[in-house]
Structures are given as structure tokens and as C-alpha cells.
UniProtKB/Swiss-Prot annotation:
Quaternary organization: Interacts with KDM5B.
Purpose: Transcription factor required for normal development of thymus, parathyroid glands, ultimobranchial bodies, teeth, skeletal elements of skull and larynx as well as distal limbs.
Name by which UniProt lists this protein: Paired box protein Pax-9
UniProt-annotated stretches for the region RED subdomain: 82-130
Region of interest called PAI subdomain, as start-end residue ranges on this chain: 7-63
GO molecular function, one term: sequence-specific double-stranded DNA binding
InterPro entries hit by this protein: Homeodomain-like_sf, PAIRED_DNA-bd_dom, Paired_dom, PAX_fam, WH-like_DNA-bd_sf
Gene Ontology cellular-component terms listed: chromatin; nucleolus; nucleoplasm
DNA-binding region range list: 4-130
GO terms for biological process, alphabetical: cellular response to growth factor stimulus; endoderm development; face morphogenesis; negative regulation of DNA-templated transcription; odontogenesis; regulation of odontogenesis; regulation of transcription by RNA polymerase II
Top-level taxon of the source organism: Eukaryota
Length: 341
């Protein structure tokens, strides 16, 4: 009886992919081969692929069996529940034990013999898949048991909610009108700020209020920034400047020391007490237009007390004498020229 499902090969025969050839067809292939029929003729006659016929005949000649699969069957299972239990016990006693040490201990304790002892790779796979998760879960449970209960911390900003438990002081915040009440288990530590002031943004007022409510000791509260004005400070005396005594300011200005390398404010000398600059050297009336190098003095930005805008250093240039000499020389040259003509 042919199967009702399968595929058709090149010869027109039906086969099921992944399934072994039925035993009846296997036996018929062997019988035809013993009659002296060639494998190619057996393949055409039974509509079985040539490779399948050759493989079945080769296995029959080697082992004498027509059954599919391994001859001796699969290896018996060695990782029995008893072996896994002993491996778990060894691992719990010594978490740093190696797989080869577990194998030797199984043999030493008589749990397994040399024929059914699991291999090192099998023990490693058991430790990784079956015992590894249980060991991690046990460590996590023990860690949770020994872990102390976290103390509720102060929220940095009452705008955001934190996973820490809500303290009793934070739960005392009244609910704004028109907003439905929120249960204490899901309520936020603080309500939304009423303004965009520095105090509300940073949460200074809420933190200090919470500390003062939960602490038995008295702690000063931080006042609102808007309440800090100039009216809260004491009025300054009429003889004071910006709240400081004039006498103290005068003493500091009089005896104050200037930084190194800079003169003090009171050490400057007035311009009237300074001596005038020395008079420059006289220029001969018969010299051409020139001036001594010492006469070129770099002027300052301020004017001398006895000087003018043209002579800020109170040193007059003898320009009249020089110009008179030049004029006499010009007149003499003109007279000589006229007499020569």
C-alpha cells in the first residue's frame, strides 16, 4: 500500500522526504540483487532512485542488515535525573568546581561506571542549561532576602516622580481645587509648581518643608525669594553712603595701599607743583632750518600749568630769532644780485 502523501522522483516513484524507505521495498531490493539483477535495473523496476538502491545494498553487504539507522542503536542516555541531582549537589557545595572534577567525583562515589559516565561536554551542558539558571535564581533570592529595605529618599524636584516610597510628609500636600484626589500609593511626591520661580524649579522650599516636617529638631526654613526686598533691611544713616560710614571710607581712601607696581591714589602730584622742562638749546640765526634732536620731546596728553596749547611744556621756541636771521640772509642775497646786475 503506497502512502497517500509524498513526492514523485525522476522515475515516477513516490517517496516521502526525510522518511526511510519502507522495509518491504528494502527487502525486495536485496532479493533482486541476489538474483543477479543490476542496481540500475532494480532502480527502474521498483522506481526507486539509484542512490537509494546502492546505499541499501552497500549497508547489507557490510552489516547484513536492511534496517535503517545505526546498527547498534543510539547510545543509552547517561544524564539520568540521579546524575543531574548529584551534579547539582557538587556544584552547590563547591561553586568553582570544574566539569572534569565532577566527572571524577561521579566515578569515585559510584554514581556512574566507566561505561555510562557522562562526558565532560555533557556535564558542562548540564551545568549551563539545567543548573546554571537554578543557581542564579537561588543567588538572586538570597540577595533579595539579605538586602535591606531602601530608605525613602528626598525627591530632588517635586515635578518628577521617583520609584522610591512616598513619605508621610510628601503625602500631606493638599490637592488643588478642581483636581480629583489621587491615592497615596500612586500619588506624586509633590504637586506641580504654581509659578516658574527659582524656588519652585529647584524644589528648595519643598525639600526644606519635608525635612522640617519629618525631623523632630527645629530647622530654619528657606524664605520665598519674592519676600526678600529692600524693605526688610534696616535703613542706612543719613551720613552713610550705601549703608557704610563716610569716615571709614575716607580712612580707607587716605591710607589705602595700592597694588604692587602701581602708585596709590593719593600719591599723584598736581601739575602746578612740577618744575618746568629745561629750555632747549638756542639756534644760531645763520644756520639753515634745523633743530637739535633734544628739542623733539614727546608731549603728554595733559597741558602744563604755565604753558599754552602750542607749547604745553612752557618752553618757547626762539622762532622769531631764527626767522629774523633767515630774513636778513635773504635780503643780503637779493642786494648782491641787484648790484651784480
Amino acid at each position: 500500500m503506497e502512502p497517500a502523501f509524498g513526492e514523485v522522483n525522476q522515475l515516477g516513484g513516490v517517496f516521502v522526504n526525510g522518511r526511510p524507505l519502507p522495509n518491504a521495498i528494502r527487502l525486495r531490493i536485496v532479493e533482486l540483487a541476489q538474483l543477479g539483477i543490476r542496481p540500475c535495473d532494480i532502480s527502474r523496476q521498483l522506481r526507486v532512485s539509484h542512490g537509494c538502491v546502492s546505499k541499501i545494498l552497500a549497508r547489507y553487504n557490510e552489516t547484513g542488515s536492511i534496517l535503517p539507522g545505526a546498527i547498534g542503536g543510539s547510545k543509552p542516555r547517561v544524564t539520568t535525573p540521579t546524575v543531574v541531582k548529584h551534579i547539582r549537589t557538587y556544584k552547590q557545595r563547591d561553586p568553582g568546581i570544574f566539569a572534569w572534577e565532577i566527572r571524577d567525583r561521579l566515578l569515585a562515589d559510584g554514581v556512574c561506571d566507566k561505561y555510562n559516565v557522562p562526558s565532560v561536554s555533557s556535564i558542562s551542558r548540564i551545568l549551563r542549561n539545567k543548573i546554571g539558571n537554578l543557581a542564579q535564581q537561588g543567588h538572586y533570592d538570597s540577595y533579595k532576602q539579605h538586602q535591606p529595605t531602601p530608605q525613602p529618599a528626598l525627591p530632588y524636584n517635586h515635578i518628577y516622580s521617583y520609584p522610591s516610597p512616598i513619605t508621610a510628609a510628601a503625602a500631606k500636600v493638599p490637592t488643588p481645587p478642581g483636581v480629583p484626589a489621587i491615592p497615596g500609593s500612586v500619588a506624586m511626591p509633590r504637586t506641580w509648581p504654581s509659578s516658574h520661580s527659582v524656588t519652585d524649579i529647584l524644589g528648595i522650599r519643598s525639600i526644606t518643608d519635608q525635612v522640617s516636617d519629618s525631623s523632630p529638631y527645629h530647622s530654619p526654613k528657606v524664605e520665598e525669594w519674592s519676600s526678600l526686598g529692600r524693605n526688610n533691611f534696616p535703613a542706612a544713616a543719613p551720613h552713610a553712603v550705601n549703608g557704610l560710614e563716610k569716615g571709614a571710607l575716607e580712612q580707607e581712601a587716605k591710607y589705602g595701599q595700592a597694588p604692587n607696581g602701581l602708585p596709590a591714589v593719593g600719591s599723584f602730584v598736581s601739575a602746578s607743583s612740577m618744575a618746568p622742562y629745561p629750555t632747549p638749546a638756542q639756534v644760531s640765526p645763520y644756520m639753515t632750518y634745523s633743530a637739535a634732536p633734544s628739542g623733539y620731546v614727546a608731549g603728554h596728553g595733559w597741558q602744563h600749568a604755565g604753558g599754552t596749547s602750542l607749547s604745553p611744556h612752557n618752553c618757547d621756541i626762539p622762532a622769531s630769532l631764527a626767522f629774523k636771521g633767515m630774513q636778513a640772509a635773504r635780503e643780503g642775497s637779493h642786494s648782491v644780485t641787484a648790484s651784480a646786475l
